[in-house]
Amino acid sequence: MKKICVLFCMIILYTSINPINSLAEVETAGLTKCQESPAFTKRLNNSVKKLETRLAKYDANTPPAIALQTQIIKTKIRFNKYAKSGILCGTDGLPHLITDGRWNHAGEFMIPGVLFLYITGWIGWVGRGYLRDISQTTKPTEKEIILDVPLALKYCLSGFTWPLAAIKELTSGELVADNKDIPISPR
């Protein structure tokens, strides 16, 4: 029964991430591509102009002048990357993230979001394993304060498979505690 429930949840998750009727090139809430946005170009020109105004106050080969020249180059490169990436900009000229599930915008939000969830899951799974292991030692509180580095490294190196291990423990019943093992505080 638990396997069927897990399979059903995975199917629901997959279909919610992959919408069938997504339209690829529909404008979203009045947003335009940054390279076509006059406000984006104006913002670039204003940023470069401010830096060039500051640059005019210094002699040519002084450290502040070199730092400002480098900052001007980096600003132009940053704006150029936004323009080439296809990210959409608003009327203010600022890039906006589209989080509606379309795959052509996956690089903006979904991929970093999934990566964030994977890394936080890794940290939680490794910490859980370490705490469960040290709870069986004679001084668990001491090992929470002063880490047992070899043991912690063992869990860190094996933590990258945490999604598979979590599914295995969920289907075998190890992940979820019984109701009788959970204390209820009297009120």
Curated annotation (Swiss-Prot):
Instruction: Spell out the InterPro entries in the cross-references.
Output: PSI_PsaF, PSI_PsaF_sf
Q: Give the principal location in a single coarse category.
A: plastid
List localization entries. Plastid, Chloroplast thylakoid membrane
Query: Keywords assigned by UniProt?
Result: Chloroplast, Membrane, Photosynthesis, Photosystem I, Plastid, Signal, Thylakoid, Transmembrane, Transmembrane helix
Q: Where are the transmembrane segments?
A: 106-126
Tell me how this protein sits in the membrane. Single-pass membrane protein
Q: What GO terms describe the biological role, i.e. biological process, of this protein? A: photosynthesis
Q: Where is the signal peptide?
A: 1-24
Any one GO CC term of this protein is: chloroplast thylakoid membrane
Described by its record, this protein's role is as follows: Probably participates in efficiency of electron transfer from plastocyanin to P700 (or cytochrome c553 in algae and cyanobacteria). This plastocyanin-docking protein contributes to the specific association of plastocyanin to PSI.
Family assignment from sequence similarity: Belongs to the PsaF family.
- What is this protein called in UniProt? Photosystem I reaction center subunit III
**What is the organism of origin for this protein?**
Gracilaria tenuistipitata var. liui
